[in-house]
Amino acid sequence: MLQPINVSMESLNLITLAPMLVAIAGGLIILILDLINKNLHKSLYVMLTILILVIDFGATLGLNVNERGFFDVMLIDGVSIVSQLLIIVASILFTPLALTSKRFHEYSYPEFFALFLFMVAGFQFMVASDNLILIFVGLETASLSLYTLIALHNRSNSYEAAVKYFTMGALAAAFFAMGSAVIYALTGSIELYRVADVLAARMGETGLMIAIFGSSVLLLVAFAFKLSLFPFHTWAPDVYEGASAPLAGYMSVVPKVAAFVVSIRIFGMYIDLGVEWVRVVILVLAVLTMTLANLMALVQEDVKRMLAYSSISHAGFIIAALALDTTEGTTAIFFYYGLFMFTNLGAFAMLWMSRHKNRRFNARFDHPYEKFAGFIKIMPMGAVIMAIFMLSLAGVPPFSIFWGKIYVMQAAVNSGYVWLAIVMGLNSAIAAYYYLKLVVYMFLKDPVKDVDTVYYNLSKPLMAVVGFAAVATIAAIFYVQPLVSYIYYMISASGY
């Protein structure tokens, strides 16, 4: 006879679900409002989305470190809290970019904002669990929403970008599912902390090591797709080019933060178990990714594609910190992205500000270098701000990403990987060329005579976001130490 199962509300610890429930409820509220009144202005949806994200931020801050909830599938540790805060802050920065002076129809759809909030919830589920099924559900929820958001830009290359991203995402999901199935077959569990205990007790068995090799390869391929690591990066430039500029900037930060968290949990477990070849493969992928992406960025004719390859290179830079498997290395991942999101979102937002009619500068690209020729004479403050973002991405002191690069290289040296720090330094020098190339165009080239080919998509909310990102980039020297201290405390409290 079946026995009744008694589950107390206290044991469920539903507070661990609060941030995700806020985002999901917010998306449903937006859809209900649209059903009630079809004529609401997009500014209402923007403000409502920001309000929901602020509440989500508060709910995340209120979580206690190292708690489990909802049948133990939710894991609230320092890694999950820090990554959720990064995801929410980047989402808050992105949302006002919908309030442009020119009309872009995707932002007039309430479905856009509802899908956006569902996507945020999906990423939060990914980072707040060590249960492989819930990670997969969060991954697919976020990915399916993101594919749709790309396609809503409603241009032929946007549809192409959405299909490419969907295809690559489906492949990554298949590899993740197969890798997870191998882990379950080996251990009888889908919770990573239990998986680690079972594998530790059986290390040394020949058959087990072969199976671990198989699962590791499958999962490495899955996350190489998601993080756009070499040689699984080829989709990224085309997808970034087809997406709207703000969404491309968002994609360069938030999905990667979520993927890094899951990678830390899975590959950190393998490295801790002594599967040293996983560390070696990650280091090789890191070096190849940052180097080849930088070389490809050198020959790009379009600023947006250059920034796409730049984002790939930065992902390669950061994946090296994961291979270190130290508290300092893990801290470096979140510290770097905490600085990177302001600069990169700001740079993509600057592309959103200036557009050229009928592609007169270039038949293929929306943002060719020629469009920015003499930008200092046409839009002086815009040129200065864009130069700040480029100098920061190049790692020039005292701008924000300089401190991130220094911290990552310091973590590598402290772990005994001096050669890795040297490779990082050389790649930063290569990258400086293509960032400074745009600065040269803006400050030293003459503007195109027919200035009417360019129009400016300016609005006060957009200028506020770009201004805030610029201030955060310049003033990093004043908050890097508190930020590092907070992240280090949260990471060490989680045992990483």
Curated annotation (Swiss-Prot):
Reactions accelerated catalytically: a quinone + NADH + 5 H(+)(in) = a quinol + NAD(+) + 4 H(+)(out)
Molecular function in Gene Ontology: NADH dehydrogenase (ubiquinone) activity; NADH:ubiquinone reductase (non-electrogenic) activity; quinone binding
Name assigned to this protein: NADH-quinone oxidoreductase subunit N
Originating species: Sulfurovum sp. (strain NBC37-1)
HAMAP family: NDH1_NuoN_1 (MF_00445)
Entry-linked Pfam families: Proton_antipo_M
GO BP terms: ATP synthesis coupled electron transport
Keyword set includes Transmembrane helix: yes
Main location as per UniProt: membrane
Subcellular location: Cell inner membrane
Highest taxon of the lineage: Bacteria
Signal peptide extent: none
Keyword Oxidoreductase: no
Binding partners and assembly: NDH-1 is composed of 14 different subunits. Subunits NuoA, H, J, K, L, M, N constitute the membrane sector of the complex.
Membrane-protein topology: Multi-pass membrane protein
Role: NDH-1 shuttles electrons from NADH, via FMN and iron-sulfur (Fe-S) centers, to quinones in the respiratory chain. The immediate electron acceptor for the enzyme in this species is believed to be ubiquinone. Couples the redox reaction to proton translocation (for every two electrons transferred, four hydrogen ions are translocated across the cytoplasmic membrane), and thus conserves the redox energy in a proton gradient.
Family: Belongs to the complex I subunit 2 family.
Keywords, comma-separated and alphabetical: Cell inner membrane, Cell membrane, Membrane, NAD, Quinone, Translocase, Transmembrane, Transmembrane helix, Transport, Ubiquinone
This enzyme's EC code(s): 7.1.1.-
InterPro entries hit by this protein: NADH-Q_OxRdtase_suN/2 (IPR010096), ND/Mrp_TM (IPR001750)
Transmembrane annotation, as ranges: 12-32, 43-63, 79-99, 108-128, 132-152, 166-186, 207-227, 257-277, 280-300, 306-326, 333-353, 383-403, 416-436, 464-484
